[in-house]
Amino acid sequence: MSGCSGNCSSCGESCSDRKPESLLAEPNKKSNVKKVIAVVSGKGGVGKSTVTSMLAVAMQKLGYKTAILDADVTGPSIPRAFGLHEQIVGSDDGMLPAETPEGVKVMSINLLLPNETDPVIWRGPVIGGAVKQFWTDVCWGDVDYMFVDLPPGTGDVMLTVFQSLPVDGVVIVTSPQSLVSMIVSKAVNMARMMNVPVDGFVENYSYFQCPDCGKRVEIFGKSRLDELALQFSLPVLARLPINPDIASLFDEGKMAQADVSAVLPAAELMAKA
């Protein structure tokens, strides 16, 4: 059309040149985040936050600048995993994320509360708005890989993240129980419906390895992950054993010291993508 400014958002005309309106939120002007990886699970109790923490530490050990955006607003655990308890501070440009001594940056609702045990009793739209602000109002600085720790399920927060953040990939955390396969399928299908690429699966609690004889015991039953991976044509990025040491380090706020060798292959694959 003659006289078209190219700004479709301020134009009321209907024409063939109209571009679809983007729902992506603008990052903070002090942020330079190269890749955003969402970590999701179809249900709770599969160790998603543990896997998120391990991936961030693994990427950091590979020499990348990493960050975690804790989008699990009503059940945040990332700050405690890294021993971060002090409230964050702000600047003229926005909020400054907490940072571990090793350099992993973290933003979580718990870092804004006067007391980390205070409950967050918000409805879905308010929670979604807070997560979006963690992207727009936080000065992340230079970050090579940002991992977004999403709450379980396929609700409002996942929708907000997939629509508002430039998600480059999704890692789906699962466990060997048969029920999980059905629920994980929902997460894969949602990502694909929203044109968000899925990197693959990480199976947690895959087995327990006896420290004496080395025998692997499938405590939660035989895994069906290979069937699921074949069904969706997705790779299995890692199978993580039950590791009491990892659980202890998470509770003690020392995840930066954890042995992350089990997820290093997954981190290396993502780095090559």
Where are these regions (language model features)?
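C-terminal lobe/tail of nucleotide-utilizing enzymes
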Residues: 1-23, 188-273
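Phosphate-binding P-loop
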Residues: 28-34
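Residue-level signature of catalytic and energy-coupling elements of molecular machines
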Residues: 33, 44, 70, 78, ...
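Walker A/P-loop phosphate-binding motif and the immediately C-terminal alpha-helix
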Residues: 35-73, 188, 194
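Phosphate-binding loop that captures ATP/GTP phosphates
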Residues: 65-66, 71-116, 128
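Glycine-rich phosphate-binding loops of nucleotide-dependent enzymes
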Residues: 107, 150, 163, 199, ...
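Phosphate-binding/switch loop-helix module in NTP-utilizing enzymes
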Residues: 113-161
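Conserved Switch II/interswitch segment of TRAFAC-class P-loop GTPases
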Residues: 141-148, 154, 166-187
